[in-house]
Every structure is written in C-alpha cells, then in structure tokens.
C-alpha cells in the first residue's frame, strides 16, 4: 500500500519552512506584541543567568519553533479530539501557571520554586501528549530543552531574587503575563 500524501507532504514542508524562519528577529510575525515583549525579557533573563547569548537565543528560538509548529498543526486540522482536549488542559494549566507566577511576584515571601517547577513540567508533559506523533523527536527535544530550563529551580530562584537585573526582568515578564491574562491570550 502506497502511503504517499500530497497534503502530508505540504504540511511537512510548511512546518520545515516555518521552523527555519523561527528566530527572535521574525518572532513578531507569528506572535503578538505582548508575547514578543515577554519572550524578549525571558531572553534577557536567560542570557544573564547562563552568561551565554547563544544559549538564550537557542531557548527562545526553540520556544518559537514549537509554538509555530503547533499553530500549523492546529490550522491544518491535524489534531484529533483527544489531542485538542489535551491542548485545552494545557491552556488552562498555562493560565494557572501565569497567575501563580504573577502572584508570587506581587506578594512578597510567597515564592515557591517547587510549585512553579512542578507546574512547568506538567505543562511540558501535556504538550508532549497533545503533539505526540505529529512532532519529530527533535521537536520533542526542543520542548524538553525549553521546559527544562524554565523549570530549573536555580533559574527560578535567580529570577525571583530581589537582586537586579533579575527583579527588573521579572517585573516586565509579569507585566506582560498580566496583559496576556487580561486579553485572554494565554
């Protein structure tokens, strides 16, 4: 039986093309201004924490690539009902995560890195389950890289520390998350 499909080939080409274009410079073409500001601030905080411009760029690039590929899958109607339900659970979990992150920033002495790390890893698992067979092993590796960094307790502790420049990065990230929550875009 011949399994060739033009539709499948076109979808693969579209994902490949978009993944090649996904960089910080063109991210604004695929995401709104607020999301772009949050990603820029995440880039700066990561660059400060890792002391590596290359690592910070890789993190944001991987995040954008996965988001773009997921958007392509959604637009092409490639996800089944169960996968869409998992994505809905992921969206709800991401909203709770954003509200928790903002709350930890706004209320002194409430920060608990384990809560954020656990929730981030739950989001990672939901994303793996939802995207499943539609993404390559390399894309799943990108998901692991992004969430592994974000859930790193040392990174979270640095980000929520009262020291500069992390305090400024966190304030701008939380300002963006608050706008995204208000606009219901997360």
UniProtKB/Swiss-Prot annotation:
<dbReference type="GO" id="GO:0005737">
    <property type="term" value="C:cytoplasm"/>
</dbReference>
<comment type="subunit">
    <text>Interacts with FBXW5; TNFAIP8L1 competes with TSC2 to bind FBXW5 increasing TSC2 stability by preventing its ubiquitination.</text>
</comment>
<keyword id="KW-0963">Cytoplasm</keyword>
<protein>
    <recommendedName>
        <fullName>Tumor necrosis factor alpha-induced protein 8-like protein 1</fullName>
    </recommendedName>
</protein>
<comment type="function">
    <text>Acts as a negative regulator of mTOR activity.</text>
</comment>
<dbReference type="InterPro" id="IPR008477">
    <property type="entry name" value="TNFAIP8-like"/>
</dbReference>
<dbReference type="Pfam" id="PF05527">
    <property type="entry name" value="DUF758"/>
</dbReference>
<dbReference type="GO" id="GO:0042981">
    <property type="term" value="P:regulation of apoptotic process"/>
</dbReference>
<comment type="similarity">
    <text>Belongs to the TNFAIP8 family.</text>
</comment>
<dbReference type="GO" id="GO:0032007">
    <property type="term" value="P:negative regulation of TOR signaling"/>
</dbReference>
<dbReference type="InterPro" id="IPR038355">
    <property type="entry name" value="TNFAIP8_sf"/>
</dbReference>
